[in-house]
Amino acid sequence: MQLLKQNYKKYILDLNDAQFNRAVKPIIEQDYRINQIIEWIYAKKAVSFESFTNIPKELRNKLDEKFFLRTLKIVKKEKSLIDSTIRYTFRTADKKYFFAVFLPANGKNSVCISSQIGCPIMCAFCSSGKTKLARNLSRGEIIEQILQVENDTKEKISGILFMGMGEPMLNFNNLISVLNSLLSSKEFGIGKRHITVSSVGIVPAVKKLADDNFGVRLALSLHAVDERQRKKLVPDNLGFSIEDILKAGKYYLKKTNSHLTIEYVLVKGINISSADAHKLARLLKRCDLINSDVQVNLIPFNPVTDVQFQRPDKKSINKFKSILKLNGITVNVRQSKGANINAACGQLGY
């Protein structure tokens, strides 16, 4: 009987603002209680309704009867002794597993969160791509990653990176709902310039995100300069051409006045020749993407089990970078954190 009763409970973090108000109003007597409940969930990061100490016990009991507050469990935690990065393995209520990464940085801490369990894009250099897509993460499961990491580390999170497992643009409705919560002063209150959504370039979704005008940062995972090369690295690119993806990035910039990053994983012998660098520069110029709001982020390949690619040497990386710089492109080589615990770019897999 108790199990049957539990099945009627709602996961409170799955509810957007309007849904939350509709669900809670029938059991409260004073409207101000809504803001108190929101404060306990998001600001105080309470893990049980019993801890809502400024709310009457009768209301706490009603909340506990109607809602789940948390559904995820941290089943594994690995901390790098090199840079203090932490890799979390979460288990869902339906016994599926995914990952998040805490990235400390002198008080400006970020968390890299997942949007799906597994990934349908199957990037050849990425461990997540070897994991068959199980399902989208719900709004609540995406949000709970942040709350659990803050609870565990006792550190304030000021930056959010949608760069974990999955393609955020293929979980678009939940992405939008989560962005609303992240930007809401009543909930997380994180500035739009401190949120980055990474995508392989789902062109209609990029344009829709631009039209919604959240103004968050966008990172486009390009990784190649011609279609044949990209098909090898990003097998399921859903048919969008490199130029269409870059044009969608330009559209995003014009609509949001935000910042665009072009992500480019450097793989030895595949996409790191001088010709590749010159071609990338020409592509960016043709799409009018050489300006102060655009940065190319070069990511040297991080080792992944059963993937035969190799990391290029520093000389090759620096040569590629210098060609881009000579063409007026703002370029950075990412210093991957957590590589020794399989928490860096491309390493989030089972």
Curated annotation (Swiss-Prot):
Active site, UniProt feature: 345 (s-methylcysteine intermediate)
Any single Gene Ontology cellular-component annotation: cytoplasm
Main location as per UniProt: cytoplasm
Disulfide links within the chain: 112-345
Stretches assigned to the Radical SAM core domain: 105-342
Binding site for S-adenosyl-L-methionine: 166-167, 198, 221-223, 302
InterPro entries: Aldolase_TIM, Methyltransferase_A, RlmN_N, RNA_MTrfase_RlmN, rRNA_lsu_MTrfase_RlmN/Cfr, rSAM
A single GO molecular function term of this UniProt record: tRNA binding
BP terms from Gene Ontology: rRNA base methylation; tRNA methylation
Pfam family for this entry, one: RlmN_N
Reactions performed catalytically: adenosine(2503) in 23S rRNA + 2 reduced [2Fe-2S]-[ferredoxin] + 2 S-adenosyl-L-methionine = 2-methyladenosine(2503) in 23S rRNA + 5'-deoxyadenosine + L-methionine + 2 oxidized [2Fe-2S]-[ferredoxin] + S-adenosyl-L-homocysteine; adenosine(37) in tRNA + 2 reduced [2Fe-2S]-[ferredoxin] + 2 S-adenosyl-L-methionine = 2-methyladenosine(37) in tRNA + 5'-deoxyadenosine + L-methionine + 2 oxidized [2Fe-2S]-[ferredoxin] + S-adenosyl-L-homocysteine
Chain's role: Specifically methylates position 2 of adenine 2503 in 23S rRNA and position 2 of adenine 37 in tRNAs.
Similarity-based family: Belongs to the radical SAM superfamily. RlmN family.
Note: Reaction proceeds by a ping-pong mechanism involving intermediate methylation of a conserved cysteine residue.
Protein name, per record: Probable dual-specificity RNA methyltransferase RlmN
